[in-house]
Amino acid sequence: MSTVESSKPKIINGSCGYVLEDVPHLSDYLPGLPTYPNPLQDNPAYSVVKQYFVDADDSVPQKIVVHKDGPRGIHFRRAGPRQKVYFESDEVHACIVTCGGLCPGLNTVIREIVSSLSYMYGVKRILGIDGGYRGFYAKNTVSLDSKVVNDIHKRGGTILGTSRGGHDTTKIVDSIQDRGINQVYIIGGDGTQRGASVIFEEIRRRGLKVAVIGIPKTIDNDIPVIDKSFGFDTAVEEAQRAINAAHVEAESIENGIGVVKLMGRYSGFIAMYATLASRDVDCCLIPESPFYLEGEGGLFEYIEKRLKESGHMVLVIAEGAGQDLMSKSMESMTLKDASGNKLLKDVGLWLSQSIKDHFNQKKMVMNLKYIDPTYMIRAVPSNASDNVYCTLLAQSAVHGAMAGYTGYISGLVNGRQTYIPFYRITEKQNHVVITDRMWARLLSSTNQPSFLGPKDVFDNKEKPMSALLDDGNCNGVVDVPPVTKEITK
């Protein structure tokens, strides 16, 4: 089988500064593939839908707030069913794998991929890969059909199991080839999608008719470009329960302080949105916003002020915040888990003890309650809005695979389903921009100090806006980065 060069970004330029960052297609390296009428044409459920099929030239802009004299900017291919497909129903042998940490909605995505393949396209052969990437070469599989997945969306976790690491490209693609699999659906975070990108490149190199599709998953909402990650709404909703409990504890005792640690290794979206939704939080600390404890304008001074004013206080901190302030023994900062993520110290316990020590030194009465709901938040079933979102992601992923697209993720951009090339979501992480309006809204809600000096403000103004926020699409057109092919095993 002849080898092919590594794929390059497919960039299509149009008038008025229009740029389409297209996704790969099987016909790019397998010319002459036959096409077939889309089975949805004969599906009674869609016979009443006018213009159900997506036009080949439809695209979705990355930014919707533009200047009248500015360029139209970057666009992505619109997701949805096409009139012609590149797989016959009996030809399809699909597989689904979940990797990385748990997230609300995993089972919903699995269910809807199976349902879409089965009910929309008449696919009969669908495999579940058990235990993450390792399952490909550990021969762990389970047959999936509509009966198996019927009610799994009501459960948390993933019925396929998951793991971190275990990525061996050659073994994985060998397994795909040996089993005759021609559609691979990979659900996972940025590390998982980097692995999916490498799998796609190897499949392309071998010249296999195999579509590789990613569905991005991260409870921290730190994947760029897309509006938000599935499971995020559920995580924020569940986080409020912990905040409410901390508030009840704090206001029920003299000088009560409730400290809640939420997920957010590098990005503080859960902490920020849970704080805004709760309205009971007096201080929110996230990785993007530096803070200090001692001295004028420090955290301790603010805590004392709040206790004097109201007699209680609720503090929310993301797990990645304050790592630079913790003990001088920073060995854990150099350790990583199997996915390559840094192992962080427990900032919640450290901050709680620091607050206790401060008040003991000043001989002030204080009662602190610490709540860590981390695994409660991510292990629950998805809520209604996330269930709908997961359905859209899964259906869009299946439509794209049947249409012959490959090497992409299914994601929401400005409220529209799109196909985004792998490199755009693995190049960097999404962060809260603390000079953005949403962070200003949080500060006005909690009345906490910004803890920012002039240098911090200047540095953060240089960062691009975050995608989830209302100002997040105002940044200009960015240069197209090279395809990333490295992966941490």
Swiss-Prot record:
Its EC number is 2.7.1.11. ATP binds at residues 101, 164-165, 189-192. It catalyses: beta-D-fructose 6-phosphate + ATP = beta-D-fructose 1,6-bisphosphate + ADP + H(+). Mostly expressed in roots and flowers. Pathway: Carbohydrate degradation; glycolysis; D-glyceraldehyde 3-phosphate and glycerone phosphate from D-glucose: step 3/4. Keywords: Allosteric enzyme, ATP-binding, Cytoplasm, Glycolysis, Kinase, Magnesium, Metal-binding, Nucleotide-binding, Transferase. Its main location: cytoplasm. The record marks 191 as: Important for substrate specificity. Substrate binds at residues 218-220, 263-265, 319, 375-378. Gene3D superfamilies: 3.40.50.450. It is found in: Cytoplasm. Catalyzes the phosphorylation of D-fructose 6-phosphate to fructose 1,6-bisphosphate by ATP, the first committing step of glycolysis. Belongs to the phosphofructokinase type A (PFKA) family. PPi-dependent PFK group II subfamily. Atypical ATP-dependent clade 'X' sub-subfamily. NCBIfam families: PRK06830.1 (NF005301). Homotetramer. This is ATP-dependent 6-phosphofructokinase 3.
